[in-house]
A protein has these predicted regions:
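Phosphopantetheine-dependent thiolation modules in NRPS/PKS and related acyl-activating systems
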Residues: 1-73
Length: 73
């Protein structure tokens, strides 16, 4: 799951190397890229996300946790 999220980040963000605890917005993310990220994650993992959730889980590790939570419900 983490590898897939990293691949999505690499596709969307200009900085191609990411730490698991790097913040999406600190790495060049913005509201438009956030919408694309949300779409990619929803399609890749068959879940529904709210854009507001990304502010609580702004890292790759956090997003993996969020996806796992969504998939378990």
């Amino acid at each position: 799951m983490i590898e897939k999220i990293m691949a999505i980040w690499s596709h969307l963000l200009p900085n191609k190397t990411f730490d698991l605890n790097a913040n999406f917005f600190d790495c060049g993310g913005n509201s438009i890229l956030l919408a694309y990220l949300q779409w990619h994650l929803e399609k890749s993992f068959f879940i529904t996300l709210s854009a507001i959730e990304f502010f609580s889980y702004p890292t790759i590790a956090g997003m993996a946790e969020l996806v796992a939570l969504k998939r378990s419900t």
